[in-house]
Amino acid sequence: MAKKIIGFIKLQIPAGAANPAPPVGPALGQKGVNIMEFCKQFNAKTQSEAGMITPVVITVYSDKSFTFVTKTPPAAVLLLKEAKLQKGSGEPNRNKVGTVSREQVRRIAELKMPDLNAFDLDGAEQMVMGTARSMGIIVED
């Protein structure tokens, strides 16, 4: 018989830097998951992408065991990295803070494709361009 799922936990954690401090500890502690075991497994799996924010979905089972799936970093984080910015604009419709090329947008869309609900690469590019626009980043052709 399959183990019964008692919940899902969605977190965004810096790759290779999970520790029992908030937000990881309290979220996992509520479900009774072994926090240190998760931290060790997550850090081992994501150490190659150190520093990037990595979304993770943790599935918790009735016997307090767990599995987790890591996703690609958020498009906003990838855009900030490509544009070499610290943060987006507070007023994106008035203040533009940086620019990215169409090739950079395509690269981000290719990386994000497994996690986006787009049928093709053009649709994924449009989603990434929309994220850039909402952050005050100009996309140049």
Swiss-Prot record:
Checking Gene3D superfamilies in the record gives:
Ribosomal protein L11, C-terminal domain (1.10.10.250), Ribosomal protein L11/L12, N-terminal domain (3.30.1550.10)
In alphabetical order, the GO MF annotations are: large ribosomal subunit rRNA binding; structural constituent of ribosome
Q: Name the CDD domains on file.
A: Ribosomal_L11
A Pfam family annotated for this UniProt entry: Ribosomal_L11_N
Share the record's PTM remark.
One or more lysine residues are methylated.
Domain of life from the UniProt record? Bacteria
A GO BP annotation: translation
Alphabetical GO CC annotations of the entry are:
cytosolic large ribosomal subunit
Keyword set, alphabetical order: Methylation, Ribonucleoprotein, Ribosomal protein, RNA-binding, rRNA-binding
Coiled-coil spans in chain: none
Q: Which InterPro entries match?
A: Ribosomal_uL11 (IPR000911), Ribosomal_uL11_bac-typ (IPR006519), Ribosomal_uL11_C (IPR020783), Ribosomal_uL11_C_sf (IPR036769), Ribosomal_uL11_N (IPR020784), Ribosomal_uL11_N_sf (IPR036796)
Protein purpose: Forms part of the ribosomal stalk which helps the ribosome interact with GTP-bound translation factors.
Query: Which family would the database say this protein is a member of?
Result: Belongs to the universal ribosomal protein uL11 family.
Quaternary structure note = Part of the ribosomal stalk of the 50S ribosomal subunit. Interacts with L10 and the large rRNA to form the base of the stalk. L10 forms an elongated spine to which L12 dimers bind in a sequential fashion forming a multimeric L10(L12)X complex.
Q: Name it.
A: Large ribosomal subunit protein uL11
Species, as recorded: Chlorobium limicola (strain DSM 245 / NBRC 103803 / 6330)
Q: What is the lineage of its organism?
A: Bacteria, Pseudomonadati, Chlorobiota, Chlorobiia, Chlorobiales
Gene behind this chain?
rplK
